A protein has these predicted regions:
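Conserved aromatic anchor
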Residues: 40-58, 94, 139-153, 240-254
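Extracellular fibronectin type III
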Residues: 3-25, 111-133, 198-227
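An aromatic-rich alpha-helical recognition segment common to small helix-rich domains
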Residues: 1-3, 18, 46, 65, ...
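Surface-exposed, proline-enriched loop/turn segments that connect beta strands in immunoglobulin-like
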Residues: 28-33, 228-233
Length: 257
């Protein structure tokens, strides 16, 4: 467990990576632009495929973009097609979806689209959005970061809405997938979003990839049972009463009454 100067803490976890095939559309962004139940939007971008053998695949080309609900979803639906002669059209904005309550995974396929010579080039590219879940506790909010991407995220930056300025202030960073914001006020709503920073391992693939999660809000509450004290009982044979003493071994439990 890592503990930060402002009292936040987190637990370690491993990032997921995958090998890449020549001709694959290398996805670089699946970033939440708008958090909404009905009007959410996601920015998706990818790198123009490198090392493309243009002898069998001399174009024109077509990108097919698919989406599935959930960061590990498998029920893909096509949401967009892009016909191109240059392969330079490498981004879309997916709109009118529920980004507040759901994460999404995207698949991008590249086809040679010549008449009589249409075929899939390489392998599809896959990457999910960054989905943040929050669990309120006593004067705290616990978070779990969910993602399914082919690059390595080296850092997650946490931001909390400042109710005075209505801007999101940085409250800490972690390279792990759980995080706790401590020292909060019970009964007050707090809103958060996170930014991931990462990149692909191979030298010829993109670094410094930045993506954002949805906005998630939570209200801390005293929903945790008090700490169990260590109890000792002493008595004297000629006395009609017992003396009961208790103590807390965890310093954080001293005020938990």
């Amino acid at each position: 467990v890592a503990v930060f100067p402002n009292g936040t803490e987190s637990k370690a976890s491993n990032e997921i990576s995958s090998s890449l095939v020549s001709g694959i559309p290398v996805i670089t962004n699946v970033s939440i632009r708008t958090t909404s139940v009905t009007n959410g939007s996601v920015y998706i971008s990818w790198m123009k495929p490198g090392r493309l053998d243009t002898i069998p695949a001399n174009g024109p080309y077509e990108y097919l973009i698919y989406r599935a609900e959930g960061i590990t979803g498998t029920d893909y639906q096509q949401i967009r097609s892009i016909r191109t002669a240059t392969l330079n059209e490498t981004s879309i904005i997916d709109t009118l979806i529920n980004t507040r309550d759901k994460g999404y995974i995207y698949r991008i396929e590249l086809y040679n689209n010549a008449p009589g010579n249409r075929f899939l080039i390489g392998e599809p590219g896959y990457a999910s959005s960054l989905f943040l879940t929050a669990s309120p506790g006593d004067e705290k909010v616990r978070f779990v970061i969910n993602r399914n991407v082919p690059w390595l995220n080296s850092r997650y930056d946490f931001y909390r809405l400042n109710s005075s300025t209505m801007r999101y202030d940085s409250i800490g960073s972690t390279n792990q997938l759980t995080y706790t914001d401590l020292g909060l006020e019970n009964g007050k709503e707090y809103c958060y979003r996170i930014r991931s920073v990462g990149g692909y391992v191979p030298d010829d693939l993109p670094k410094n990839l930045i993506n954002y999660s949805q906005i998630v809000c939570a209200t801390p509450e005293d929903n945790e049972p008090p700490c169990q004290p260590v109890i000792t009982v002493t008595s004297q044979c000629d006395s009609l009463y017992n003396t009961i003493r208790w103590r807390f071994d965890d310093p954080e439990c001293i005020d938990d009454v």
